[in-house]
């Protein structure tokens, strides 16, 4: 077998491979003989079909089958010979060959890049330190009450925090406009879902009331044709509801897994959960800083095959989480995910290099500790631990998570650390605000 290798970029390789004709013809002949022993054809006894007839009917198909297999086998052998690590599948370009000529083809493929990481001591990380005070616990309990609240019909005039069910119709210069009307829209006063003045205009209304609101769309409104426009909204209220909070009692505590010990035990459990949430949020912010700075220290070309694979994973994940079974992953534009996919692939390659360079690993003790940390938020933690430890696939996923943590801790130990004291509320905030997402609102007045 003859092999010649050409580098067409830092990560793309073009390999020309030649396989002797005798090797190809020998395998073709062997398979045709095997076919002749089993093939059934009208006018011939089984196993007695002349080879000339077998070749005429099956020769070309068998030859193409052999060529395909030999290209794959020769490609793998050539990779081993050249000590190459491909990233993704190759593109084969067979040259036209006639009977008796050597098989020659070109395999174009990408290899994993060489990842060189800069000085880890140049990385600087801000790490937050927090303290949970009693007021934080009380505030969390109030949030839990809000989450467990129920809407009850109210005959009172609508006030801040009430939910109204309304019909409304928007007009500009006496003409209705697209997205300016809705039926049975539910609006919570104070939610700031609607344009300025809309929710304030609902205060004091009761079920059955009607009102016209004269409002102005903001100059920075997302719809270009509505910016700064004066509009009238005819509103009819069909229902006013008020939020009813649950009492703080044993029944409320039981909803959150506290069966005994009363309010004191409940507050202890809430504080533990808050501490776990804050530690997780802080660790995630440290990881984000480490990742961002590692990316800045490492410049290399990313194999498109790996990016495409990550895009497909992200598409599938998006469909599972948001698609509701109504769409296919292929319907989502790849460009929506490409930038994030590139970042994920680069991060994975950098982390893998740090692991390799420093002989890092995730120990059994670390994996079990991570599983127990995760399980502690469930009502039956030991069952969760047992499930992970007895499920090889899930345990392997957890091993990957732990190994990422090991890399982050290793890099952070080399980095300059600045500790900053923050409140619980600041501790659980993300490092950067997520990008605003366009909403499929019920109306343009939102």
Curated annotation (Swiss-Prot):
In terms of one coarse class, where is the protein primarily found?
A: cytoplasm
Q: PANTHER family, from UniProt?
A: TRIGGER FACTOR CHAPERONE AND PEPTIDYL-PROLYL CIS/TRANS ISOMERASE, TRIGGER FACTOR-LIKE PROTEIN TIG, CHLOROPLASTIC
Locate the compositionally biased regions of type Acidic residues. 437-446
Gene Ontology biological-process annotations = 'de novo' cotranslational protein folding; cell division; chaperone-mediated protein folding; protein transport; protein unfolding
Provenance organism: Hahella chejuensis (strain KCTC 2396)
Family as reported in the entry's similarity comment: Belongs to the FKBP-type PPIase family. Tig subfamily.
Instruction: State if Chaperone is listed as a keyword.
Output: yes
**Keyword Transmembrane assigned:** no
Q: Where in the cell is it found?
A: Cytoplasm
| InterPro entries (alphabetical) | PPIase_dom_sf (IPR046357), PPIase_FKBP_dom (IPR001179), Trig_fac (IPR005215), Trigger_fac_C (IPR008880), Trigger_fac_C_sf (IPR037041), Trigger_fac_ribosome-bd_bac (IPR008881), Trigger_fac_ribosome-bd_sf (IPR036611), Trigger_fact/SurA_dom_sf (IPR027304)
Identify the NCBIfam families for this entry: tig
What is any one of the record's Gene Ontology cellular component terms?
A: cytoplasm
**Reactions catalysed, as given in the entry:** [protein]-peptidylproline (omega=180) = [protein]-peptidylproline (omega=0)
What role does this protein play?
Involved in protein export. Acts as a chaperone by maintaining the newly synthesized protein in an open conformation. Functions as a peptidyl-prolyl cis-trans isomerase.
| Highest taxon in the source lineage | Bacteria
Q: What's this protein's name? A: Trigger factor
Listed A to Z, the keywords are: Cell cycle, Cell division, Chaperone, Cytoplasm, Isomerase, Rotamase
């Amino acid at each position: 077998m003859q092999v010649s290798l050409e580098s067409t970029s830092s990560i793309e390789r073009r390999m020309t491979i030649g396989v002797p004709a005798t090797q190809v013809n020998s395998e073709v002949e062997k398979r045709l003989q095997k076919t002749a022993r089993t093939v059934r054809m009208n006018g011939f006894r089984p196993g007695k079909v002349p080879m000339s007839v077998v070749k005429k009917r099956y020769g070309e198909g068998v030859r193409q089958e052999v060529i395909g297999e030999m290209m794959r086998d020769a490609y793998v052998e050539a990779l081993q010979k050249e000590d190459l690590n491909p990233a993704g599948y190759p593109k084969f370009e067979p040259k036209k060959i006639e009977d008796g000529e050597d098989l020659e083809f070109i395999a174009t493929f990408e290899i994993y890049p060489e990842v060189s990481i800069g000085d880890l001591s140049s990385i600087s990380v801000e790490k937050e330190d927090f303290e949970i005070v009693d007021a934080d616990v009380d505030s969390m309990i109030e949030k839990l009450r809000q989450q467990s609240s129920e809407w009850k019909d109210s005959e009172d005039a609508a006030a801040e925090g009430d939910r109204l069910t309304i019909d409304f119709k928007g007009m500009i210069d006496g003409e209705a406009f697209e997205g300016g009307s809705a039926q049975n829209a539910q609006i919570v006063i104070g939610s700031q879902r609607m344009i300025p003045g809309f929710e304030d205009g609902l205060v004091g209304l009761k079920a059955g009331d009607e009102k016209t609101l004269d409002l102005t769309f903001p100059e920075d409104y997302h719809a270009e044709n509505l910016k700064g426009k004066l509009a009238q909204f005819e509103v009819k209220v069909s229902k006013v509801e008020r939020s009813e909070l649950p009492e703080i009692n044993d029944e409320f505590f039981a909803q959150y897994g506290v069966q005994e010990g009363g309010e004191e035990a409940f507050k202890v459990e809430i504080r533990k959960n808050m501490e776990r949430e804050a530690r997780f949020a802080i660790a995630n912010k440290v990881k984000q800083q480490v990742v961002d700075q590692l990316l800045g220290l490492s410049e290399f070309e990313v194999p498109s095959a790996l990016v495409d694979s990550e895009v497909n994973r992200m598409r599938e994940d998006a469909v599972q989480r948001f698609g509701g079974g109504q769409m296919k992953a292929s319907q989502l534009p790849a460009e929506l995910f490409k930038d994030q996919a590139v970042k994920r692939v680069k991060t994975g390659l950098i982390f893998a290099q740090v692991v390799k360079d420093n002989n890092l690993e995730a120990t059994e003790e670390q994996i079990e500790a991570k599983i127990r940390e995760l399980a502690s938020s469930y009502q039956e933690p030991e069952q969760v631990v047992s499930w992970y430890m007895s499920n090889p696939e899930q345990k392997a996923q957890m091993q990957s998570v732990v190994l990422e943590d090991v890399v982050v801790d290793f890099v952070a130990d080399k980095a300059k650390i600045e500790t900053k004291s923050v409140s619980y509320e600041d501790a659980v905030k993300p490092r950067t605000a997520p990008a605003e997402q366009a909403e499929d609102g019920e109306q343009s007045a939102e």
